[in-house]
């Protein structure tokens, strides 16, 4: 069986790997597995997308596939991934679909599904869809005549979602000046509207999408421009979202980056103080900084580590009934309010803590001392072979001996791209960079595409 689904749906270069033909099949087979075979003759399906130019092409093909199986499709237009998850659950739809490749370059696109409960698919559901994709021509229902359903536009869904987000905070942001970076993606209009509606004074960059500039030197993967904007406009802080709005990175008033670990710590500390943190637990991944765990320990907060990927964080949160979790990269899940990482939700919760405590973001983030961390991505021929490569294991052992317990190493395949990620934490910046480069050089030499 071919593996179509990665850790975050089906992704690839639009019109080359993720073709309209594949999008049609994903709509048809996904609609059948997740909605139609539950006995619903005309299951309701919500479809949203980000701002990529390929989104319209894939949306048309996907919707055709869904309608061909009998689905009643409501098109949400440009909206964030967590917006689709929330509306799917809130409106009682059988299925939600988001067309986006998140933080990836504009040439890529992706399709991810949400069940009626607003959660991403289980491995079993993905396997069922993949089994149909691997068949030559599976015999599935084909409605005809009056059984073919019109699709409709529900662009008001975005406002319904923003109204819900606004209801999750008890304060307005009058007196706060906030710089926003929409990554020229899904939150480009949503973020300024939401924070403006909460009476913040806003400055914006990356909020002028043209179909081609999504994530281009902007957004949560490139917060440097936002840092400049914060300092230049004397903003209290800045918030950078990614292309589909499911992750967030902040910038303090001095232009210093505040990552997902620090944001989780700030929000978790406030929840713990207010006795709102379930089981005094925050769920994180193996990528979280050593300083994050030490800071939690000092606050009397426990932590659980998962594999990298917000789906694994969510699985652990559901298993243990935990209500806060996330990743250093800025996927932060607040289960009391939504079922997936939500940049806008996290942003207003962070702003709420800043407003209520009267403390600056640098002061709040400074309570967590980060260990220097170096991350190098290596493009490789087969990312899954890194775990068995003898030469890579050998250099990792050598570095661990040299570190003498003062740091850690993590080498793993990316869940969404043909990359091996090499992460090293050490006592100093120089050590972290040197050790990471030593390991990355071996990965490149033995497995790299350009070796």
Swiss-Prot record:
Q: Does the keyword Metal-binding apply?
A: yes
Q: Name one GO cellular component term.
A: cytosol
Q: Name one GO molecular function term.
A: phosphomannomutase activity
Amino-acid positions noted as binding Mg(2+) in the UniProt annotation, renumbered to this chain: 102, 242, 244, 246
Superkingdom of origin organism: Bacteria
Where Phosphoserine occurs along the chain? 102
Cross-referenced PROSITE patterns, in alphabetical order? PGM_PMM
* UniProt keyword annotation of Isomerase present: yes
- Entry's EC annotation: 5.4.2.10
Q: What reaction(s) does this enzyme catalyze? A: alpha-D-glucosamine 1-phosphate = D-glucosamine 6-phosphate
Q: Which GO terms describe its biological process?
A: carbohydrate metabolic process; peptidoglycan biosynthetic process; UDP-N-acetylglucosamine biosynthetic process
Describe PTMs of this protein. Activated by phosphorylation.
**What keywords would UniProt list here?**
Isomerase, Magnesium, Metal-binding, Phosphoprotein
Tell me the cofactor note. Answer: Binds 1 Mg(2+) ion per subunit.
Q: Which InterPro entries match?
A: A-D-PHexomutase_a/b/a-I, A-D-PHexomutase_a/b/a-I/II/III, A-D-PHexomutase_a/b/a-II, A-D-PHexomutase_a/b/a-III, A-D-PHexomutase_C, A-D-PHexomutase_C_sf, A-D-PHexomutase_CS, Alpha-D-phosphohexomutase_SF
What the entry lists under CDD domains is as follows:
GlmM
Q: Which residues form the active site?
A: 102
The record's comment on protein family reads: Belongs to the phosphohexose mutase family.
Q: What else is known?
A: Disruption of glmM results in a drastically reduced methicillin resistance and in teicoplanin hypersusceptibility.
Relate the protein's function as given in its record: Catalyzes the conversion of glucosamine-6-phosphate to glucosamine-1-phosphate.
Q: Which HAMAP family match?
A: GlmM_B
- What's the name of the protein? Phosphoglucosamine mutase
